[in-house]
C-alpha cells in the first residue's frame, strides 16, 4: 500500500520552531495514560513469566475491547507524531485509558476490509490524501502540512466515531481489534475473517462473506454484467432501486459542485482578507502623520479593517469545517450508497442468469428424456420386426429344404449333364455296383470346379482389361484409399471413446440431471441472497436518509450562523468607527 503512505512534513525541515507549529504532540509514554494497566504490563514484561500467560493477557485485553460498548464520543485523536521506525506519520487515538497509534494507510485498509466484510453497509468515507486547495493557497510547506494534519485528525476522528455509531459496523470484531493496542494490524489482515474473504464478493454469501458454507456452490456462480438485463426486465423493486441509483449519482455530482463553489468563495474571501489587511496597514501609516481627533479616526478605520480581516479568516475557517467538509462527506456517502445499490443489482442479475441457465438445462433434459423414450419405442418396434423376420426366415428355410429334396430327386431327369448322348455311354451305367457311381460323382465335381475356375479367370481378365482401358483409375482409387485411412482412424478413435450410443445417451441424461439439481441449489441460495440484500439495502438507505437530513440541516444552520457571526462582528467594529467619526465631525 505504498500509495497510502503519508508524506512526513518534518523530513525536509530542520527548523524546530517551524515543526512545533504543526500541532504535533510529543511521544507520550504509555504509563502516563494507562493508569492501572501499566501495572499489568510491568507484570507481563517480567522475564520469569511464560509466553503463554502473555498471550492470555493479550487475548483478554482484546476480548474486553470487543465485548465492551464503545462510546463514540470517547474516541479522540489527540495528535500526530513521527513513527519510531520510518518517516511516516502516525495518529494517536485515545480510547478510555489506552492509546493506539495508527498511520493513514491502516485507516484506509480498515475501511476497505469493512466494505468487503459488510457489502450492504454504508462505511463512512475517509479524508482525501491530498487536496488541490492545499496547493492553490499561497502558504509555506509547514503551514500546508499543519493544515493537512489538523484536517486529517478531525476527519479521521469523525470516521471512527461514525463507524462506532453504526449498529453493525460498531460491533465488528475487526473494528474492535483496530482499537486494541495489543493487536498488530498486519496480524488482523492475515487472520480470519479477513483471510477467508474471496476475491469477488459476488461469489460469497452477503450475510457473511467469510463463511465457508456452500462454498462450492458460490464458486460456480456466474459473474454478471451491469448491462446484461435491460431496464424493462426488472421488477418494481428493482426499478425503484435503479431510480434511486440514478438520483444518488446526480446528487453526488451536485454536492461536489457545491463544494467546489464554496471553495471558490473561500479563495475570494482570502483575497478579501488580504485587501482589508493592506487597507488597515495603509490607514495606520496615514495616522502617523496626523494628530488629534483625525489621528484617532484614522487609527479606528485601520483597526476596523484589521478586525474585518480577522473576522473573515475565522469565517473561512468555520466555513471549511462546518460547510465544505460535510458537503464532501455527503457527496462521498452518496457515491458509496450508490455502490451498495449496484451490488444489489449485480446480485439480482446473477439470480436472473442462474434462472436462465436452469431453464435451458431443464429444456435440454426434457429433450433428452423425450429422445430416450422415442429410442425405447424404436428399439421395441425393431425387436418385434426382427421376431417376425426370424419366423419368416425359419419358414422360408423349411420350405427351401423341402424344395431342395424334391429337386434332388428329379436331378437325373432335368440336369443338362445327363444328356442323351452321355446316358448312352456304356462307361457310366445307371445301375450296378457303388464303385462306378462314386467315380461318376468324382468326375462331375472336378468338372464343376474347373468351370468355376475358368469363370473367375475370365472375370479377372475382364476387370484388368477395363482398368487398363479407363483413364480415371488414379482418380477413383485415391479417394477410396483416403476414405479407408479415415475409416481406420475413426475406428481407432471410436475404440478409444465410448461409442455405445445408448450408454452415451444415458450418461448425458445423468450429467444434465445433476446440473439441473446443482443449478436448483444455486437458484435457492441466490434467491435467498437477493432477499437478504434487498432488506439490508432498504434498512441502510433509510438510515442514510435520516442521517442525511440531519447532516444537511446542520450544514445549513452552521452556514447561516457563520454568516451572521461574521456580519455581527463587522457590524460592531464599524459601528464603533462610525461613532468615532461622528465625534470628529462634531
Curated annotation (Swiss-Prot):
Modified residues (Phosphoserine): 19
Listed CDD domains: PX_SNX41_42
Biological process, per Gene Ontology: autophagy of mitochondrion; meiotic cell cycle; protein transport; reticulophagy; retrograde transport, endosome to Golgi
InterPro entries: AH/BAR_dom_sf, PX_dom, PX_dom_sf, PX_Snx41/Atg20, Sorting_Nexin_Autophagy
Bias (Polar residues) ranges: 8-22, 31-46, 401-410
Domain PX: 69-185
SMART domains: PX (SM00312)
Major subcellular site: cytoplasm
Pfam families named among the record's database cross-references: PX (PF00787)
Membrane topology classification: Peripheral membrane protein
Acidic residues composition-biased segments: 412-423
Coiled coil ranges: none
Keyword match Ribosomal protein: no
GO cellular component, one term: endosome
Annotated SUPFAM superfamilies: PX domain
UniProt GO molecular function: phosphatidylinositol-3-phosphate binding
UniProt: a 1,2-diacyl-sn-glycero-3-phospho-(1D-myo-inositol-3-phosphate) binding residues: 103, 105, 129, 152
Compartments where found: Cytoplasm; Endosome membrane; Endomembrane system
Key words of the record: Autophagy, Cytoplasm, Endosome, Lipid-binding, Meiosis, Membrane, Phosphoprotein, Protein transport, Transport
Function according to Swiss-Prot or TrEMBL: May be required for cytoplasm to vacuole transport (Cvt) and pexophagy. Has a role in meiosis.
Stated family: Belongs to the sorting nexin family.
Protein name: Sorting nexin-41
Organism: Schizosaccharomyces pombe (strain 972 / ATCC 24843) (Fission yeast)
Higher taxonomy: Eukaryota, Fungi, Dikarya, Ascomycota, Taphrinomycotina
